[in-house]
Each structure stands twice: as C-alpha cells, then as structure tokens.
Amino acid sequence: MRKVLFFAFALVASVLAFTSCKGNKIDSPIVGTWKYATDPAPDSGWWTEYTFTFGGDGMFSLLDVAHPGTEEVYDGFIWTGPYEINGDIITLHKNKMGEYSSGQTKYYDEFEPNDERMKFSLTGNKLTLTREYGTEDAWEEVYTKQ
C-alpha cells in the first residue's frame, strides 16, 4: 500500500511542479521519467531511489527516497523547477524543495534556490548524469527511462 501511495504522490508532485510555472519548451529525448537506484548498503541494507521527470515544458522534478532495506518507503526529498540544456550540459534551477515523510509532503517556505549543472549523455533508454560536474568529487549515475 505504501508503495502505491509513494508512486501516486510522485505523479501528483510532478504534475503540480509542471503546471505551477512555465519553463522553456524542450524538444529532446531527455523528456520523460528516469529512475536510478543505489546498491543496498552492505551493513544496513538501506538503498536510495532517484526519480527524475523532465517535462517538455522545461520543468523538472527530482524525487529522492530512502528505503530501509525493503521496498517500504522511509523518507525523502523532492526538488522542482525549470531546467535548460546547452550542448551536453543540463542545468537544474531548483526553486522549490519539499520533504517527503510517511506519505506526506511538506514544502519548505525558506528554501534558497540553487542551480545544479550536470553533464549528460543518452544511449537508447539509458541516461548517464555526471553529478558534481567539474569537481574532483564527480560521480556518474545511470538512469533507465520508464
């Protein structure tokens, strides 16, 4: 039941994010929903699931949810805002952030908007994002189109 509520919440949050403000029209294969999950931690079994939704209207949502070694959702965060693509760089303009816990979302009133730049590449139904792009701490995540 929690899993169903989680996915219903993700869908509603994405729709609200995309209809709340207008971004730039994006005509790219990146438009759609992409998922990535970390491997379970060896000591605790905890794992994290990331869901990016990129809309054709230039708006995105990123849902980051932790799982306690099971499919059960523990808690997480959601970011929304416009995005833009310039060559192989995608910039997320994070202008709203919320916390997801026990099936409910609470958006922060005092969230300082920030931008995140990532290098990306598309191969078939795989999206590779390089997070912390341009730093020595950079890492890659490979998302699958849903």
Kindly give the residue locations of the regions a language model identified.
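Positively charged n-region of N-terminal signal peptides that target proteins for export
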Residues: 1-4
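Bacterial N-terminal signal peptides
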Residues: 8-15
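C-terminal motif of bacterial Sec signal peptides marking the signal peptidase cleavage site
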Residues: 17-20
